[in-house]
């Protein structure tokens, strides 16, 4: 046998008897190679007879341009890959059929790429639709192969056994539910043992890791049956089912069938990379957040509930089985434990015990993407996962049942697909909704510029009243260094420019408000004059300052100024003389105008922090536009005169009792006295710890009875925690109650804070954004 014959070249065997005898011996020794060597020759000879062309022996070789060429397959089978021959996309391929190896024809294993070394072998399977045996291709292949005569019987056997022999036969035993269901389909019922099989029993889902999903062997191929036909009670529907279009993993959340991924059309060499690419695209498109068109929904842009998997995909469905694989409640009509389906708490595959076991005694576990609806979102550590999840399941099951009943009444065989806009009205809340305010309202509402001149005048007057002459001079020097720059940048601006500047400020503030609401860090935003323009809820909890007070919508009754230095005027006496701060909703600086005044940033910091801030602000205002400052400061707690009186009374009650119990008893007496006086409404819901005053600022002569502010200060949360000797550890600071106790002894909260300056289109400092974190 010549070398060309061994390599499968189309050169016909020589006519010499000796060569024929030698070839016959080789064929007897290796019949597979003999059939291979004859197949190209027969194929070439057939082509020559049909085209009516005659070729010489020199032209009938592999380099012949007229030789019909095979289309290169995306992945060769194992036999063709080992022989380095051209294979086809069909399974079994033509070469294996001619060699009689159709039973062992399967995809070859490629060498892993470096970035896939950590991927399991089961995840590197090729595309599902590409590798399943196509009936139409099988019919065409059978018609083209009938000319070969002896190969027709092998083709018939290959068509019958292709589904069972595509993967290893040993792995087919993992899915016991299908074998049991197949044996009972002819009888029209399914025994209860099928429903209690371990392959679909929720008790088999051990959840080894927070992000784990039910373990299904992707390397196995179940029998050619449909899930819906296996679970139905009519044998007629089971006989009409076609081949399963979704392969083996019916319950695997990472399976591409759950998202309508067409892996074969992605031109990936392996399933692992294609699935990762498709999942990233599914996440990036935000399915369920933005309502796409119905046509896009039918193509695969489905929402979180995966509602487009209807009975049209899975065959006929009876009234006892809704036409959804993964509905809003996860598989709520599967009842593996055999219990009654009237209890909505037990109608899902993740029953109450499973959910409680996964999320009960540990931190809230995460779930794989799209493995469950948004009802499985991780709750807070202080909530009860069992109660939260089950309440959400009750609501979801009720709505799902009503929708399923309506679909069965209209058309149980072809229910209409549920579009993503319809899912948004099912009661699924995804995060906090964006406020309905439109940016267009900002441009329509701003009609006049903001008076920064009066703001700086008010700031100067406040600094002169609060600080000593030496500290006032330090702040004045810092502001004087940037005053020429402000004058130079604003002297060319007209009225329209100033209005546009205010519109830019309001529009930027509109964006920052969303950021503040989404971020859990205590944050404030103020103008370049230091006036507070926006504040987060966490800042109010930390310092006790209400948002309405900071923004100038309510009177500012704070008397806590830190008390670290004597004031410039000797005493902090307001101009109106009635004990009300000038910035308490009255006219600015005691003058006319009737404009409410927001709180200045200097009112929130102690003396040293204010001086340090303005020195840094002078360097950063017209310096580095992307720069920021990170340092420490002391925030002043909000305290009124009534809070000071309540704290003073608590200290007097403390002195009469033992050290170990005096603090708690005194605090309790204050709480009782304050509670009998009025309700805690003055200082807001987030500022219930306002009895955290500095003892240096406490006026012993002031014996006014506690008002509503003192009631808030000595409420039930903090009535027994007013002892100045009490210390707080890291474990004691938890929730709003713990944050309110920070700085309750001296009225100061030591914080680390970072702030930056944002400029407008005229390169003028527009606003200051500050983030605080308490030092515990």
UniProtKB/Swiss-Prot annotation:
PROSITE patterns, per database record: ZN2_CY6_FUNGAL_2
The UniProt entry, under SMART domains, shows: GAL4 (SM00066)
- Protein origin, superkingdom: Eukaryota
| Pfam families associated with the record | PAS_13
Bias (Low complexity) occurs at: 142-155, 218-229, 670-714
Q: Where is the composition biased (Gly residues)?
A: 657-669
Q: Which GO terms describe its molecular function?
A: DNA-binding transcription factor activity, RNA polymerase II-specific; RNA polymerase II transcription regulatory region sequence-specific DNA binding; zinc ion binding
Gene Ontology biological process terms from the UniProt entry: cellular response to starvation; gluconeogenesis
Q: What is this protein called?
A: Transcription activator of gluconeogenesis HCAG_03671
């Amino acid at each position: 046998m010549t070398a060309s014959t061994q390599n499968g070249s189309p050169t016909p065997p020589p006519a010499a008897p000796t060569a024929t005898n030698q070839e016959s011996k080789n064929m007897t020794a290796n019949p597979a190679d003999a059939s291979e060597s004859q197949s190209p020759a027969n194929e070439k000879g057939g082509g020559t007879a049909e085209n009516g062309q005659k070729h010489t022996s020199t032209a009938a070789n592999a380099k012949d341009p007229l030789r019909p060429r095979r289309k290169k397959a995306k992945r060769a089978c194992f036999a063709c890959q080992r022989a380095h021959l051209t294979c086809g996309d069909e399974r079994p391929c033509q070469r294996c059929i001619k060699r009689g190896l159709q039973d062992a024809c399967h995809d070859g294993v490629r060498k892993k790429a470096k970035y896939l070394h950590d991927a399991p072998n089961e995840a590197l399977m090729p595309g599902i639709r590409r590798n399943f045996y196509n009936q139409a291709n099988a019919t065409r292949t059978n018609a083209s192969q009938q000319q070969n005569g002896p190969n027709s019987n092998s083709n018939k056997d290959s068509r019958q056994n292709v589904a069972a022999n595509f993967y290893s036969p040993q792995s087919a035993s993992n899915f016991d539910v299908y074998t049991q269901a197949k044996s009972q389909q002819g009888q029209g019922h399914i025994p209860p043992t099928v429903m209690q099989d371990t392959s679909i029993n929720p008790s088999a889902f051990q959840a080894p890791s927070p992000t784990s999903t039910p373990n299904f062997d992707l390397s196995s191929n179940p029998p050619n049956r449909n899930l819906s036909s296996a679970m139905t009670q009519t044998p007629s529907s089971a006989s009409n089912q076609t081949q399963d279009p979704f392969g083996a993993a019916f319950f695997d959340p990472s399976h591409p069938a759950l998202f309508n991924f067409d892996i074969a059309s992605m031109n990936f060499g392996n399933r692992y990379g294609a699935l990762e690419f498709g999942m990233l695209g599914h996440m990036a498109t935000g399915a369920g957040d933005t309502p796409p068109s119905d046509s896009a929904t039918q193509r695969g842009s489905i929402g979180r509930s995966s509602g487009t998997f209807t009975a049209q995909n899975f065959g006929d469905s009876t009234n006892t089985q809704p036409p959804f694989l993964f509905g809003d409640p996860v598989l709520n009509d599967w009842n593996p434990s055999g219990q009654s389906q009237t209890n909505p708490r037990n109608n899902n595959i993740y029953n109450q015990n499973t959910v409680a076991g996964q999320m009960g005694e540990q931190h809230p576990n995460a779930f794989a993407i799209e493995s469950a609806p948004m009802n499985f979102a991780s709750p807070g550590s202080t909530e009860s996962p069992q109660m939260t999840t089950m309440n959400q399941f009750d609501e979801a099951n009720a709505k799902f049942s009503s929708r399923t009943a309506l679909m069965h009444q209209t058309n149980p065989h072809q229910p209409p697909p549920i579009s993503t806009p319809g899912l948004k009205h099912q009661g699924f809340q995804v995060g906090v909704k964006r406020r309905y305010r439109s940016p267009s309202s900002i441009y329509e509402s701003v009609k006049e510029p903001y008076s920064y001149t009066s703001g700086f005048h008010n700031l100067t007057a406040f600094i002169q009243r609060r600080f000593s002459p030496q500290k006032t001079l330090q702040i004045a020097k810092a502001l004087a260094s940037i005053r020429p720059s402000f004058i130079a940048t604003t002297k060319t601006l007209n009225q329209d420019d100033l209005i546009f500047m205010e519109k830019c400020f309001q529009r930027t503030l509109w964006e920052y408000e969303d950021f503040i609401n989404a971020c859990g860090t205590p944050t404030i935003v103020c103008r370049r004059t230091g006036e507070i323009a926006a504040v987060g809820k966490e800042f109010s909890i930390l310092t006790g300052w209400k948002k309405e007070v900071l923004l100038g919508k309510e009177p500012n009754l704070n008397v806590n100024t830190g008390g670290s230095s004597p004031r410039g005027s000797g005493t902090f006496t307001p101009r109106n003389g009635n004990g009300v701060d000038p910035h308490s909703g009255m006219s600015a600086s005691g003058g006319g105008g009737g404009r409410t005044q927001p709180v200045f940033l200097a009112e929130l910091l102690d003396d040293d922090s204010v001086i340090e801030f303005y020195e840094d602000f002078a360097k950063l205002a017209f310096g580095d536009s992307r720069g920021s400052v990170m340092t420490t400061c002391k925030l002043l707690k909000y305290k009124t005169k009534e809070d000071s009186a309540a704290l003073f009374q608590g200290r007097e009650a403390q002195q009469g009792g033992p050290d170990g119990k005096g603090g708690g008893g005194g605090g309790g007496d204050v709480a009782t006295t304050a509670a009998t006086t009025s309700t805690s409404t003055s200082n807001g819901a987030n500022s219930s710890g306002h009895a955290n005053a500095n003892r240096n600022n406490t006026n012993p002569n002031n014996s006014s009875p506690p008002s509503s502010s003192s009631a808030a200060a000595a409420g039930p949360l903090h009535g027994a925690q007013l002892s100045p000797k009490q210390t707080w550890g890291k474990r004691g600071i938890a929730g709003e109650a713990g944050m309110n106790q920070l700085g309750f002894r001296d009225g100061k909260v030591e914080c680390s804070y970072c702030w930056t300056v944002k400029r407008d289109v005229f390169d003028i400092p527009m606003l200051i954004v500050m983030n605080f974190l308490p030092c515990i």
